[in-house]
């Protein structure tokens, strides 16, 4: 639950949050990653994966909450273990959701071969990942708020970095290392901004969100002029938190 104290910490002008984001971005986004085919089958397995998989079925109704995790455990007969197994609570459920949605992008490989330009493939990948939010779109503001808590920021940035890795790999980007790092951070910025936009989108089939993604990629000049998108990343995160706090009357 968002407390007044955490709200004050999150809304302390730009200085505190941007310092925190800057340090964490360097750590989370500063290493060249790998496609999920090179990762272990899953970072979450066994009993935990079963509980979280069941918990996701309750997210459309309950949101990313401890109640959803408890319901997921109870369906498997683990009525007393759910909270003990997931010390980060809702963030553990969100991380599993991110992981599952990222892995699903590999199914686009055949379609991506029909798109000639890298920028077009990136648009398709970002849009497809956003489509994974359809069933839980009403809970996106809650999810964004949880991800932006200081205690969860490193984990959420790590998930975002892995998503950017996946998108660049599947888009068959062949950049040299320095340019690749810039693109990775920029895709993280564009995806974060698009997800925030989607949380407010009331257009049919989220058409406005799709147009927003296209515009951001075009604005980046086919992924060659990305500095502004990188610099705007922190501002989008800060605005997301402020919007959520305002909606809750804090």
UniProtKB/Swiss-Prot annotation:
Major subcellular location class: mitochondrion
Subcellular location: Mitochondrion
GO cellular component: mitochondrial inner membrane; mitochondrion
Keywords carried by this UniProt record: Lipid-binding, Mitochondrion, Transit peptide, Ubiquinone biosynthesis
Pfam family for this entry, one: COQ9
GO biological process: ubiquinone biosynthetic process
Pathway(s) per entry: Cofactor biosynthesis; ubiquinone biosynthesis
Family the entry assigns: Belongs to the COQ9 family.
Physiological role: Membrane-associated protein that warps the membrane surface to access and bind aromatic isoprenes with high specificity, including ubiquinone (CoQ) isoprene intermediates and presents them directly to coq7, therefore facilitating the coq7-mediated hydroxylase step. Participates in the biosynthesis of coenzyme Q, also named ubiquinone, an essential lipid-soluble electron transporter for aerobic cellular respiration.
Protein's UniProt name: Ubiquinone biosynthesis protein coq9, mitochondrial
């Amino acid at each position: 639950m968002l407390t007044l104290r955490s709200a004050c910490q999150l809304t302390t002008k730009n200085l505190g949050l941007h310092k925190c984001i800057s340090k964490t971005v360097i750590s989370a986004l500063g290493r060249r990653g790998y496609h999920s085919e090179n990762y272990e089958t899953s970072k979450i397995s066994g009993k935990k994966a079963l509980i979280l998989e069941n918990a996701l079925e309750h997210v459309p109704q309950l949101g990313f909450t401890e109640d959803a995790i408890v319901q997921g455990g109870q369906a498997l007969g683990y009525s007393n273990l759910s909270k003990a197994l997931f010390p980060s609570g809702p963030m553990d459920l969100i991380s599993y959701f991110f992981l599952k949605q990222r892995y699903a992008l590999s199914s686009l490989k055949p379609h991506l071969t029909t798109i000639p330009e890298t920028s077009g493939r990136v648009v398709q990948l970002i849009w497809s990942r956003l489509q994974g939010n359809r069933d839980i779109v009403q809970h996106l503001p809650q999810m964004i708020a949880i991800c932006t808590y200081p205690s969860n920021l490193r984990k959420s940035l790590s998930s975002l970095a892995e998503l950017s890795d996946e998108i660049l790999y599947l888009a068959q980007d062949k950049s040299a290392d320095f340019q690749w790092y810039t693109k990775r951070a920029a895709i993280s910025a564009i995806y974060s901004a698009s997800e925030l936009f989607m949380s407010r989108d009331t257009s049919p089939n989220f058409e406005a969100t799709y147009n927003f993604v296209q515009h951001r990629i075009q604005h980046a000049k086919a992924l060659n002029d990305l500095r502004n998108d990188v610099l705007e990343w922190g501002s989008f995160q800060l605005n997301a938190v402020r919007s959520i706090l305002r909606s809750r009357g804090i």
